[in-house]
Every structure is written in C-alpha cells, then in structure tokens.
C-alpha cells in the first residue's frame, strides 16, 4: 500500500495566494492531479478554520475527508527571531492529529503575540527550537518539518537568514524533527551530500499558492493513509519515491541579481565574487551554491536511505509549449482537463501514459514533449534571485 501526498499548500487566506483556494476546489484539483492526501493548510486562520471544521469529516485516525479526498490538519509557520547575533527567519510545516490540538496551537500562538486574523501563514516571535518544544507540549503527536530548507530568506539552511546545520537551529529538539522539505530549487540528490541532514527523511511538496500548482512536487509514502502511518513514514523514511520539479526551474537555483539580469554558477561566483558586476550590490546566493557550501565529500547520506525520485515538467506547461500559448490561456486549460479526465489524472499522464494514448488524446506534439521530459531531454534556463527558470523539451 502507498499514498501520494502534497503537504505544503495554502488557502485563500494566506498572503499572495489565489482566492480560488477553497476546500471544494482543492479537493476537485486533487482528483484531477491524482493526489490522495492534502494538507488542510493555514489552520491557524479563524475563518479558514471554521470552514475546515464545518467541511472536513473524520476519516482514518487523525485524517479527514472532503468529497472523497483525504486531508491532514497542517499549516506553515514563519519563525522570526535573533540567534547567534543574526536575524533568523525559518518556515516550518506543522501537522496536528486533530482539532483539539489545533485549538491548543492557536491559543499558544496568540499568547506569543502572533496575529492570526491576517496571514494564513502567521509570523511567530519564537525560535524554531522553542516553537517545536511548545508544539510537542500541546500534543506529542504534532509533527514539525522545516519547509523549503534552502530558500535564501525563509529556509532553515538558507544563505540569508538560515543556519549551517540542523542542530544549530533546533538544538535539543533536533531528534524530534523527522524530515526536511527540499523546496523547488533543490532535488533529493542535491541534499544527499549534506552531512547536516543525515538521518532525516527527505520529502518534497508543492508549496502551491494557486490550484494549478498543486502537486508540482509530491511524496509517495508507503503504508495506509492514516495519521500514524504518515508519522511513521516521516520518521522511518518510508518513502516510495518523490515527484520533483526540475530544480533549475526553481526561482532561487542559481546565484544572481534579477534587476540587472545577472546569474552565476557556483564556479563563476567563486571566480567573480558575490557582488553584482553591474551595480555592485550583493548577489542573492543560489541554492546550488549554498548546497555546495554545506556539502562535504565523504560525509554524504547512507545510500540505503536514498529514495528514487522523478523529475517532471507540469502538464500545463507542456501544453502551453506545444500549443504555443500562455499557460493561462482558456484553450490550454480546456485541453489540460480533457486529457487528465481521459487518461486518469496528471501524474498518470506524465509518468505512465503510453505514447499512443498521449498522441491520441493530446496530439503528436504532446506525446513527444512528455516522452522527452521523461528521458531528461530538456533545455533549461535556470532561475535566480526570485525569477523562475524555464524547462522545455529539447529540439
């Protein structure tokens, strides 16, 4: 048994997120994508919590369901604090076993001064270590997973406000952190060489701020779809595989300065320095550079702990490419839903559908595009300094 999960999502009550992120729409898109388990997202927001309480029905122990899709109570918290003489900003994914724990978490956050009526991703004036301890005091079944750990400003290991090691961030709570999220700008292999992550399960989720971006990264867990199975899956690395963005498409993959159009590989950064050659301002160090700083030859993860992963380009992007239209064009959206309906969901289309079926339903151009991406035959312009990269089928 296994289940496919996207556990980093947001509701319409999180800043810079689509107003279409309703419970009904999220469930509908999960079916289109082929996702079996979603995070409820943003459970600290009072209006969204009321919608979750009314709409979600108890399912397997610790899980809930809405229109046939399973949900786990989850949210993202932004810890902003000072430690070691530096300002820190670390985003954490938090999961709770039930609504009683959620209410306890909200009460605790309010006591720390967090404004829960605003952003669905509230800011918390506590260290990642202290917040983890407080969460476990509320319910020992709560789980904490550092989010997009390499993002420069908001990642646990980010170049701007992060740390150099897991235990620097979490101290005596490190043993209670079962897993880390790769983020869009890194893939599992990039994380395998980082000694600071040894013994931690590597997971990938979408961090979707809109419905079409749900499932752009996923983790397939072994076991049944229950809260205990999820907890064991995270703690014991019971991951069957992850589905990945091409990390080069992430918006912080390379070092650079977007305003001046400057991007650099790690080798170029070592040679040229960390200031923009055009304006002299500091460059935003990319994820691939930061990974290199923290990787140590001979201290990579146990190969037995490594799990398979598959890099894919979103179907909507492949359709936009083959149809020569923008990804938000109505005709692209109609084609997307028709193909997913006929072939059994986006994940199936991208990973399993045969060439003949792809050609029959989507045309020769789509069949060729999907096949090339599966074979790794792509043309890439890497992202940098907040600008997404592009991935296109080669040729």
Question: Predicted segment positions?
Answer:
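Histidine/acidic-residue-rich catalytic or RNA/ligand-binding cores of hydrolases
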Residues: 15-18, 49-53, 154-161, 192, ...
């Amino acid at each position: 048994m296994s289940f496919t999960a996207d556990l980093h999502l947001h509701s319409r009550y999180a800043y810079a997120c689509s107003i279409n992120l309703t419970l009904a729409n999220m469930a509908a898109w999960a079916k289109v994508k082929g996702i079996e388990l979603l995070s409820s997202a943003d459970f600290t927001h009072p209006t969204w919590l009321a919608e979750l309480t009314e709409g979600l029905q108890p399912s397997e122990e610790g899980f809930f369901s809405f229109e046939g899709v399973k949900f786990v109570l989850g949210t993202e918290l932004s810890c902003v604090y000072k430690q070691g003489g530096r300002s820190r900003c670390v985003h954490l994914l938090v999961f709770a076993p039930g609504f009683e724990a959620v209410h306890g978490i909200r009460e605790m956050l309010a006591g720390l001064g967090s404004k829960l009526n605003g952003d669905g991703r509230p800011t918390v004036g506590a260290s990642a270590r202290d917040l983890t301890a407080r969460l476990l005091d509320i319910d020992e079944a709560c789980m904490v997973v550092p989010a997009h750990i390499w993002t420069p400003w908001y990642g646990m290991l980010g170049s701007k406000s992060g740390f150099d090691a897991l235990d620097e961030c979490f101290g005596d709570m490190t043993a209670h952190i079962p897993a880390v999220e790769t983020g869009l700008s890194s893939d599992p292999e990039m994380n395998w060489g980082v000694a600071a992550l040894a013994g931690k399960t590597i997971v990938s989720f979408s961090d979707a701020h809109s419905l079409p971006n749900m499932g752009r990264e996923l983790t397939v867990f072994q076991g049944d779809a229950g809260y205990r199975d999820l907890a064991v899956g995270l703690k014991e690395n019971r991951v069957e595989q992850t589905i990945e963005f091409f990390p080069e498409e992430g918006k912080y993959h390379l070092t650079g300065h977007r305003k001046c159009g400057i991007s650099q590989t790690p080798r170029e950064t070592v040679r040229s320095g960390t200031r923009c050659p055009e304006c002299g301002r500091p460059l935003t160090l990319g994820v691939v550079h930061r990974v290199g700083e923290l990787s140590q030859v001979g201290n990579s993860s146990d190969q037995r702990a490594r799990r398979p992963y598959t890099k894919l380009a979103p179907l909507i992007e492949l359709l936009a490419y083959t149809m020569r239209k923008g990804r938000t064009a109505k005709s692209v959206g109609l084609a997307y839903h028709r193909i997913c309906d006929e072939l059994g969901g986006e994940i199936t289309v991208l990973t399993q559908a045969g060439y003949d079926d792809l050609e029959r339903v989507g045309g020769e151009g789509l069949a060729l595009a999907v096949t090339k991406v599966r074979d790794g035959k792509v043309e890439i312009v890497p992202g940098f300094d907040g600008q997404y990269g592009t991935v296109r089928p080669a040729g």
